[in-house]
């Protein structure tokens, strides 16, 4: 898929007398200097008119929402008629879709200002909500009333913080307040949709800050994390509470979903294994096993693939094991884990040490 082909489609539609625009994420990415993954198009033309314009290359893939897919030499392009959405009684999908006359009406139904921009074939931007300004300010902000946007589709709550993580942006104050006050709406969202957003969020450049600022949001679908927030480890090897250490550990490892999920859940069983010795030092004997058991349940609940779930649980159960730095010790571990997971385990151990205390950075560097 390419901008050149998308532009050609726009001009073809315009040649038939209908307005057409690139919309949503591709416009955002272009303004950020990134190559878009998808090229979505919105047009004043109705689905049947798009079918007439493109003939055998057009396929009705979402007529209920006014969407027709046009197959080109380099991929498939979705073209959706300008529309407005009705009420969202299920908090996920509009009860009814009504075709609109203008691009401004279409953009008004979108979730975030940075996703509510359009670009015509001449390069003119339609930006009624100052999404371009928010890109410059590096801010995630809802279109209109944030509370209303989240009531329409609760997944937008997680999408907002996901964009903050991935783009390295902050969340605008009113939007942030609405996220915290309406986080419970996420309870109605399917686990599969949660997992897609979380995979992206965890691999974002501002993941640590988002995890620390929005633990209450994650706690809706991973309530096991909440007891870790503010839980002092009472140990000379740790300068952070369990949850803060977790956020730093996630940030310290390569942005790959299995590794990031491993770090998010690697100490989730610490609260349940906490003891204090006579000297007042906290210990968490057996926490890798308990954390692994809890992680297995969490990953299954989120409908994670079996192989991914198994890898995450294995890495968690091994993350605190002492592997002798000998040919035999390394060989035994590699035989038990396989080469890929053994290499992952080294990354896990390094990130865990980096997130403990500044004076332990030498251990991470040794690993």
Residue locations for each model-derived region?
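Catalytic cores of the polymerase beta-like nucleotidyltransferase superfamily
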Residues: 1-367
